């Protein structure tokens, strides 16, 4: 199984990756992308089961990437968790409209993120 971590902040990508490293022992592959366009390239090539997606990014924001995954690519089996500092209800609704499965605000609890990843992957 594959997880894609997408964030334009290198330290946050590393933090998320470190939070999920234990899953690699269970056969999960972690992939990284620094912006929305790169994320879509990885998604098309690797077809991850889970995408952890920052909202505010250059080139293509997380809402647009999520909508592309769900509606243009038709990858309805790909589970998307939006990660963002934008915690207002209007942002949550926009995420739902884009097809996101869950929405977590930053700063996030690494243990909660791990629990969500395990639940999605069924491990």
Regions from the language model: what does each represent?
Residues 13, 57-59, 76, 88, ...:
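The feature encodes the CheY-like receiver
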Residues 108-117:
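C-terminal output helix
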Residues 30-37, 92, 110:
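Conserved Asp/Asn-Gly motif in the active-site loop of CheY-like receiver
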Residues 32-50:
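Acidic, metal-coordinating helix/loop segments flanking the phosphotransfer/catalytic sites
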Residues 10-31:
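Two-component/phosphorelay signaling modules centered on CheY-like receiver
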């Amino acid at each position: 199984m594959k997880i894609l971590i997408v964030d334009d902040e290198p330290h946050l990508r590393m933090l998320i990756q470190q939070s999920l490293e234990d899953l690699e022992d269970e056969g999960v592959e972690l992939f990284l992308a620094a912006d929305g366009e790169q994320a879509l390239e990885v998604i098309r090539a690797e077809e991850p089961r889970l995408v952890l997606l920052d909202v505010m990014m250059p080139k293509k924001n997380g809402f647009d990437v999520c909508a592309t995954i769900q509606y243009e690519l038709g990858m309805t089996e790909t589970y998307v968790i939006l990660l963002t500092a934008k915690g207002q209800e209007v942002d949550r609704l926009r995420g739902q409209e884009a097809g996101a499965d869950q929405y977590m605000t930053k700063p996030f609890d690494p243990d909660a993120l791990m629990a969500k990843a395990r639940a999605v992957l069924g491990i």
